Amino acid sequence: MSRKQIYIQSAVVIFMIVLAAASRLIPHTYNLTPVGAIALFGGAYLGRNWKAFLIPIMAIYLSDFILNNLIYAQPGDAFAYAYDGWYWVYGSYALIVLLGAFLLKKVSVLKVVAGSLGASAIFFLVSNFGCWPGTVPPVYTPDMNGLMQCYISGLPFFKGTFVGDMVFSVALFATYALIH
């Protein structure tokens, strides 16, 4: 593949990631968003280097920044660069990028479906684990019962995460396959 083709391919992938991140600004059901799909797609097509992490995570961060400061902010709210527990959420995105980089070296429908399910599971497990000790005042006891209660409390949101990851993964990967 020529240098020009690689540049065009990267530009298309980046454009699709930015477009998917911008879709978060459209009202949606809880957790029915493209964030897992963005991380998976970036991991699959941006190679195993810093771009695979930086581009999807920055696109998600910029959409979070806009949502938190322009859409969800109430009058008098302080300007927010991040939110409580952000490192758990963004850590899960980094793990999803890794999943995409390794699972989707060669893209297939089955691998995209498996990757999407894996992305949902990673986000659910990591973000809820971060909620367990991270609430002030504490909501969950600092033992296995508290952790299990935290995961049980997160189950209603898993459906939106799973559907969003699946729908947006299929959309991103299928669109890219048609363009490519």
Go through each PLM region and give its residues.
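Short helix-perturbing small/polar motifs within transmembrane alpha-helices
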Residues: 76-124
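Structural signal for the C-terminal ends of transmembrane alpha-helices
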Residues: 22, 41-48, 98-107, 175-180
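Hydrophobic alpha-helical transmembrane segments
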Residues: 10-15, 50-54, 87-91, 113-117, ...
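Membrane-interface helix caps and helix-loop-helix hairpins in membrane proteins
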Residues: 22-29, 74-83, 102-106, 155-158
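Hydrophobic transmembrane alpha-helices
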Residues: 2-46, 50-55
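Aromatic-anchored segments of alpha-helical transmembrane domains
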Residues: 17-25, 57-71, 120-129
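Membrane-embedded alpha-helical hairpins and interfacial helices in multi-pass inner-membrane proteins
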Residues: 105-180
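Membrane-embedded alpha-helical segments of multi-pass membrane proteins
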Residues: 14, 29-46, 66, 86-95, ...
